[in-house]
Amino acid sequence: MTKIYPLMPLRDIVIFPHMVAPLVVGREKSIRALEDAMEKKTEIFLVTQLEPTCEDPNEGEIYQCGTLSTVMQLLRLPDGTIKALVEGQRRARIVSRVPHEEFMQVEVEECTEVLPGQDELIAYERELRKAFQQFAHLGKKIGEEVVVSCSSIEDPVKLANVICSHLPLSSKEKQEVLEVETLGGRIELLLEILFRELQLAEVERKINIKVKQKLSRAQRDYYLGEKIREMQKEIGQGEDGVDEMTELENIIKAKKMPAYARARVQKELKKLRGMPAMSAETTVVRSYIDTILGLPWKKRSKGQLNVLKAEGILNKDHYGLEKPKERILEFLAVQSQVAKLKGPILCFVGPPGVGKTSICQSIAKSMGREFARLSLGGLRDEAEIRGHRRTYVGAMAGKVLRAMQKVGVANPVFCLDEIDKMSTDFRGDPAAALLEVLDPEQNSSFNDHYLDLDYDLSQVFFITTANSLEGIPIPLQDRMEIIQLSGYTEEDKQVIAEKYLLPKQLKANGFQKDDIFLSPGAMLTVVRHYTREAGVRGLERVLASLCRKVARDRLQKGKKSKKYRIGEKSVPTYLGTPKYRYGLAEERDEVGLATGLAWTQVGGVLLQIEVILMPGKGKLTLTGQLGDVMQESAQAAYSYIRSRAKELKLEPDFYEKVDIHVHVPEGAIPKDGPSAGITIATTLASALTGRPIRHELAMTGEITLRGRVLPIGGLTEKLLAAKRGNITKVLLPEENGRDLKDVPAKIKNALDIKLVSHMDQVLEQALLSKGKNK
């Protein structure tokens, strides 16, 4: 009986029935044939080609006998090739070729197994087993596990196929065996090959013995010299008087480590003693021993528990950042009362440049501990965290243990920087590997693949940093104590610039500390109009630029002792035209124009929202590059206004007579989020009723269809934007009232803050009567 199958030609390999083999496939036709077989869940006909170098063999360039095989697994590799795992099933022969556009397809006929008589079959099987075992033990080209596996095979057909697949034969010889029709004939051919190989192996053994006996005098002298040196090492009399092995033994005895680690390193040392000095395995074992001995198993920093001293160090090094400072001082206070306290696992989340990484160093300094840092940005290989298994060439411990080895103590402050910037690929997920590192219940027995021993990380004070929680998996977030760091206010930036950044840049550019002075107004101008960021990195670069401009001016004018006093108006002389401007409150009350408050990664901003009405049929148009959430918020605001038409004294069918256009200026900047809901609703109400909106008022809050005002985030940044934009009155959701305690007093005192819970209260506060424009 014949059947049609896709065909894949093979180079330099013959697949036998019962043989499982991985194949790396690059030819397009072969890939299509594999995918077709996988998709249709059919077998594929694997046959060896006559010339391995032929790229596109035709029917006459392949053998006629092959193996019907099952495609067990397909994996597409980054270079476009496919790795396939196949298992041979039955022998078959090509009957004819069947035309196909994408790959070779043939009609094949399965080969029927012709078995000898029972007694003859038993004799064949015994001889084959005996010859194969002799060959395996004499030639040492076949592993012991293969011999054991073959000894458990009872089916003589399978036994012959498996033995032939493991013999070190050429493709041509294996093809000859595959094509023999009868089982007896195949076993006879195999026995002939095995006996020939046994004779060759015996000849090779005799030749080796003769070569060794004919070693030259110089070689014998070298051999004896090496032996004498080894004997001297055994009695501890090497070149320097102390044998290397003895030195390692002394280090092991002196090293404080757990009993299981000591037992492992002693076992490896014993193995090392019996290895030749020039062996590649010697280097591997020595590196492993050095790794174990280099780890700080029980060595700890003494540290200091003086809370007042720690607070002084933190305040000296960093301005602001109250939340992380408070958490560290709490930890020190508890540690002074508890003998053994597991290190916490903190996660500082905030925009770039606010000092997340640098405060980690200050924390280590304030606690009297060593500091280790590992950048996780761009990490995509799980083995970078857990290490590679020792079976791999060039294997080494993971980055966590290498950092511990470098820092030299078991209780450092360990900063895992940019934890949200890791990625995943076919080599694994580094975030999943960190689950054990950052779990207080598990990290006391962290198991690195290379070390293969439990290592205690429970005394490490882990701090991770991230710009956003979005890139961190939920299970990893659950293991960490999240501390949100907001951007600096303008006042904060001024203080940081005056106390830290400007003195640092003066020193870096060769100035004395009083050579350059910026007035408060000048510093505010630099902060407000030459930087737009949540942190202070850009501010430091601007101050560095100013110092360079002053240095050049001094040199050109020949006045090296001149003191520079820079006022607000002279800043553009050194830094050029201001780069940024911030939104300001409108100068007069307008109909259909309201001021909202938004929060971005670089701080708070004023958000102007405009609405105009046009004769039409009730179409609502939204422009200004609004995101999906903001568009839905606008739809909810519009629906609320329609539901309140009677209270707002609007005609019930007003929406059928006008088209409404809602626009948020600065259309090049994407905008999203629900917090503009009450602002949009107020603007719609103003445009439809003709009542102007107070120009000195700003608002923020999410709206529901029933008019409830829901809480928002980024409160401090939004209020700062209002203060900076000359806003005097702000409407906030009532539920955000509890968050006002975290807002600096100098911001709250400058604003008239009103808490609202319903949209009716917003309209009452925001809308003026008709004709009352100011």
From Swiss-Prot:
Domain Lon proteolytic stretches: 588-769
EC number: 3.4.21.53
Cellular location(s): Cytoplasm
GO molecular function, one term: sequence-specific DNA binding
Keywords on record: ATP-binding, Cytoplasm, Hydrolase, Nucleotide-binding, Protease, Serine protease, Stress response
GO process annotations (BP): cellular response to heat; protein quality control for misfolded or incompletely synthesized proteins
A GO cellular-component term linked to this record: cytoplasm
Active site: 675, 718
Reaction catalyzed: Hydrolysis of proteins in presence of ATP
Lineage top rank: taxon: Bacteria
Residues noted as binding ATP in the record, renumbered to the chain: 350-357
Ribonucleoprotein listed as a keyword: no
InterPro entries, A to Z: AAA+_ATPase, ATPase_AAA_core, Lon_bac, Lon_bac/euk-typ, Lon_lid, Lon_proteolytic, Lon_Prtase, Lon_prtase_N
Location of the Lon N-terminal domain: 5-198
Keyword Protease: yes
Induction: By heat shock.
Subunit structure as annotated in this protein's UniProt entry: Homohexamer. Organized in a ring with a central cavity.
Similarity-based family: Belongs to the peptidase S16 family.
Functional summary from the UniProt entry: ATP-dependent serine protease that mediates the selective degradation of mutant and abnormal proteins as well as certain short-lived regulatory proteins. Required for cellular homeostasis and for survival from DNA damage and developmental changes induced by stress. Degrades polypeptides processively to yield small peptide fragments that are 5 to 10 amino acids long. Binds to DNA in a double-stranded, site-specific manner.
The name this protein goes by in its record: Lon protease 2
Organism (species): Desulfotalea psychrophila (strain LSv54 / DSM 12343)
